[in-house]
Amino acid sequence: EGPKAALMDALALGERLGFKTGVADNRVGWVEYGDGEEMVGVLGHLDVVPVGDDGWTYPPFGAEIHDGKLWGRGVLDDKGPIIGSIFALKAIRDLDLPIDRRIRVLFGTDEECGSSCVEYYVENGYEMPTIGFTPDGDFPLIFFEKGMTRFTVGGKVTDKGNIEVEYFGGGIAANVVTP
């Protein structure tokens, strides 16, 4: 429900700004600008990890501004970067900057739970970018995404003298464990 609403909002924004838009079965949407055979893909996502506990300073889905900062789920990961990328397309167009290929901002709806949206896009023959990047990261720029693994640790510790766990965090979604 939430990711689909975010998908429709992002597509509507692209349309209001006068861009070409498309959607793959409500799993992946895109906003596109430019001409040319080659396409730059800017890949992000609109879903968020489950809210979890009640320890929020501000309502998690409120998108409220406090002390000049926007607070809410997805502000940094990854709705904010997607909206920023769409407005970057607008700036490129409005400044009439020369580009010789298309730029497609792609936004999936389930990155936090396995990225089946990307698999769907690829497996159903939608156009693949010639080159791309993701704004889903930290500053300064990083040049790779972390991998994902799921595992269960079990058993008994028999040699307690060699084991020391200082901290192990986690959450509801697989990619929210922090060191």
What are these model-predicted stretches?
Residues L11, I83-K90, E119-E123, G154:
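Predominant activation on well-ordered alpha-helical scaffold segments within soluble catalytic domains
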Residues G2, A6, P81, C117-V118:
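Residues at alpha-helix caps and immediate loop-helix transition turns in enzyme cores, especially N-
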Residues E112, V118-P179:
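Midchain, well-structured core segments that form catalytic/ion-binding scaffolds
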Residues M39-F107, C113:
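Active-site metal-coordination/substrate-binding segment of hydrolases
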Residues W30, R104, R150-G154:
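Beta-strand secondary-structure signal
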Residues E1-G52:
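N-terminal helical capping/dimerization or prosegment-like subdomains
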